[in-house]
C-alpha cells in the first residue's frame, strides 16, 4: 500500500509543471511514516541474516545491533569498546521514463555514519562521512528508466575518519546507527537553479544570490515576492550571464512586516529562470523573513534594532521509541513546548536538526542556534569543510536561524570559522558555544555553568555574555535551581544576550 501511495504521488507530481524540482521518496517521510527495506546487520542482535527494517530509523530501535553511549569509554576505561556493526540495506524502485534526460540525484537527509551508496551495482560516489547532514549523488547515468532499479546502501556505525568519531560519537549522549532521516530522489531539467541564498533586511532591502547550473545561453531570473495572503508586493527581473557561477538580485520592498520571535512574518520568493525569449526553464520557491541581526559589541544582541535576550533551551533530536529518527508530531510537540514555556530560542545541541523543525521555528517564531557537531572535539578541516557547506546550504534561508555555532565546548575547528560566510549570503554571526573562559568569539562569551557570583563578574566585563548551557542538574544544584535569580541578573544587565538552559 505504501509503495502504491508513493507511486501515485510521483504521477501526481509529474502532472504538474515539469520545470520544477520533482521528488520521489524511497523511504518514508518521517519516523511515523516509514517504508520497509531489506536489511542485514553484521553483528549484535538479529544479525547475520537478511531481514526487514523500517526506513527511516535507528537500527537499534528496530531490534538490530548493539547500543552505545558515547561516554562509555570514560566509565569503563581501557576495557571499553564501541560496537561498530554495519548495516546493509537493499531497496528496489522505478523512476518515470519522463525523467530520462534530466538530472536525477539521490538525497540522504541523515545517515549514521559512513554511508556507501550503489545503484544497480555501481558506485554512486565517494563514501559520505558525517551523520547529521544532507548529502546527495548524481545518479542520472546509473538508472534504468521505467524499469526496476536496485539501491544498495552500506552504513558503518563508526566512521573510518577518527575526527568524525571524535566530533559526533565520543560524546555525552546515546549514539546510534542507520539511515535515520528520509531518502528521496530529485529530478531537475538540465538548465536549473541549484539553490538561492536570501538576505532580507528589516528596512525592506532584499538581496538574493542565485546559483544556476547547466545554462546553454544567457538567461533571465524573474523574482516575485508575495506576502502571507499571496499578494504580490514586488517583482524584479535580473539578467544572468551563462558563464557566471551566480547572479545577485537586488530590490527594496516597502511597507514590509518584519520577522521576530513575536512577529514571525514570512514571505515567499518565487524565482523563475527564463531563456532570452521568455520561455520558462525552471522555477523554485523559498520562504524567508525580513530581519536584521546585529552584535553591538559591549552592548548586546539586536534584532531589527531592538535589543533581544534569549530565553532558550538546548534540544536534542530524540524520542524514546525512535531515538534520533523523529516524526513530524514529535517535532511540533517540542516547538510548541518551547513557545508554551514562554521561551523564544533554542540551541540545536549538538548537531543540525531535521529541516522540518527549522520550518516550525520559522512559522512559530523561535530564534535558533544551528550547530555543527563537535562535542568537545572537532572535525578535521578536511572533513569539516564539506559538512559546514552541507549544513549551511540546507539551512541558509531560515529566518529563525540567527547564529551558526561552530561546535561545542572546545569542539571548535577555528579554521572553519570563515567557511560559514562563504555559503551564507546573509553573513550571520558565528559563535563558539564553550565551557572554558577565554574562548569568546565575535564579541560574545558563551561560557557554560558559571555560578551566581562568577556570572555577575562576567556580566560586568566588556563582552556580551550569553551562556549557551546553564542549570544542568549535575552542575548547578538541581535542574532549574535558582533560575529566577540567574535570569534577573541577565535581565538587568545591558551586556547580557540571554541564556540557554540544559535541557529541553
Regions found by a protein language model. Name each.
Residues 40-44, 79, 84-193, 215, ...:
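Accessory beta-strand-rich segments of carbohydrate-active enzymes
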Residues 121, 183, 267, 305, ...:
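Conserved, mostly hydrophobic/aromatic
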Amino acid at each position: 500500500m505504501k509503495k502504491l501511495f508513493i507511486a501515485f504521488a510521483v504521477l501526481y507530481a509529474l502532472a504538474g509543471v515539469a520545470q520544477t524540482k520533482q521528488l520521489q521518496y524511497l523511504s518514508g517521510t518521517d519516523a511515523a511514516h516509514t517504508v520497509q527495506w531489506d536489511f542485514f546487520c553484521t553483528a549484535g542482535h538479529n544479525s547475520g541474516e537478511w531481514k526487514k527494517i523500517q526506513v527511516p530509523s535507528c537500527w537499534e530501535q528496530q531490534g538490530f545491533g548493539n547500543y552505545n553511549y558515547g561516554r562509555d569509554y570514560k566509565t569503563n576505561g581501557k576495557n571499553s569498546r564501541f560496537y561498530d556493526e554495519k548495516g546493509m540495506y537493499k531497496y528496489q524502485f522505478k523512476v518515470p521514463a519522463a525523467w530520462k534526460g534530466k538530472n536525477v540525484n539521490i538525497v540522504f537527509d541523515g545517515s549514521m555514519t559512513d554511508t556507501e551508496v550503489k545503484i544497480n551495482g555501481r558506485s554512486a560516489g565517494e563514501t559520505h562521512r558525517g551523520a547529521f547532514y544532507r548529502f546527495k549523488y548524481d545518479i542520472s547515468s546509473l538508472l534504468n528508466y521505467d524499469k526496476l532499479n536496485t539501491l544498495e546502501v552500506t552504513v558503518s556505525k563508526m566512521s573510518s575518519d577518527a575526527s568524525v568519531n571524535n566530533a559526533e560519537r565520543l560524546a555525552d549522549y546515546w549514539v546510534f546507527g542507520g539511515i535515520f532521516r528520509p531518502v528521496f530522489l530529485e529530478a531537475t531539467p538540465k538548465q536549473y537553479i541549484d539553490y538561492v541564498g536570501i538576505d532580507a533586511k528589516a528596512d525592506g532591502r532584499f538581496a538574493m544570490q542565485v546559483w544556476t547550473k547547466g545554462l546553454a545561453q544567457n538567461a533571465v531570473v524573474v523574482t516575485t515576492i508575495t506576502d502571507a495572503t499571496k499578494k504580490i508586493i514586488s517583482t524584479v527581473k535580473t539578467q544572468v550571464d551563462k558563464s557566471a557561477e551566480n547572479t545577485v538580485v537586488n530590490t527594496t520592498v516597502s511597507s514590509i512586516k518584519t520577522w521576530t520571535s513575536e512577529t514571525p512574518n514570512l514571505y515567499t520568493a518565487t524565482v523563475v529562470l527564463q531563456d532570452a525569449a521568455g520561455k520558462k526553464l525552471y522555477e523554485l520557491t523559498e520562504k524567508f523573513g525580513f530581519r536584521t541581526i546585529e552584535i553591538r559589541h559591549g552592548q548586546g544582541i539586536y534584532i531589527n534594532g531592538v535589543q533581544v535576550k534569549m530565553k532558550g533551551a538546548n534540544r536534542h533530536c530524540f524520542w524514546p521509541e525512535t531515538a534520533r529518527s523523529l516524526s513530524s508530531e514529535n517535532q511540533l510537540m517540542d516547538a510548541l513546548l518551547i513557545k508554551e514555556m514562554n521561551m523564544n530560542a533554542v540551541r540545536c545541541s549538538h548537531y543540525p536538526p531535521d529541516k522540518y523543525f527549522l520550518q516550525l521555528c520559522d512559522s512559530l517564531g523561535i530564534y535558533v542556534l544551528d550547530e555543527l557537531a563537535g562535542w568537545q572535539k572537532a572535525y578535521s578541516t578536511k572533513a569539516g569543510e564539506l559538512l559546514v557547506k552541507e549544513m549551511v546550504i540546507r539551512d541558509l534561508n531560515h529566518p529563525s536561524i540567527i547564529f551558526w555555532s561552530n561546535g561545542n565546548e572546545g569542539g571548535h575547528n577555528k579554521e572553519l570559522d570563515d567557511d560559514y560566510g562563504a555559503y551564507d549570503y546573509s553573513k550571520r554571526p558565528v559563535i563558539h558555544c564553550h565551557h572554558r573562559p577565554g574562548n569568546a568569539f565575535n564579541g560574545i562569551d558563551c561560557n557554560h555553568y558559571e555560578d551566581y557570583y562568577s556570572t555577575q563578574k562576567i556580566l560586568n566585563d566588556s563582552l556580551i555574555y550569553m551562556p549557551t548551557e546553564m542549570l544542568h542538574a549535575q552542575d548547578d544544584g538541581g535542574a532549574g535551581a535558582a533560575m529566577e535569580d540567574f535570569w534577573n541578573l541577565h535581565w538587568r544587565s545591558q551586556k547580557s544576550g540571554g541564556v540557554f538552559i540544559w535541557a529541553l
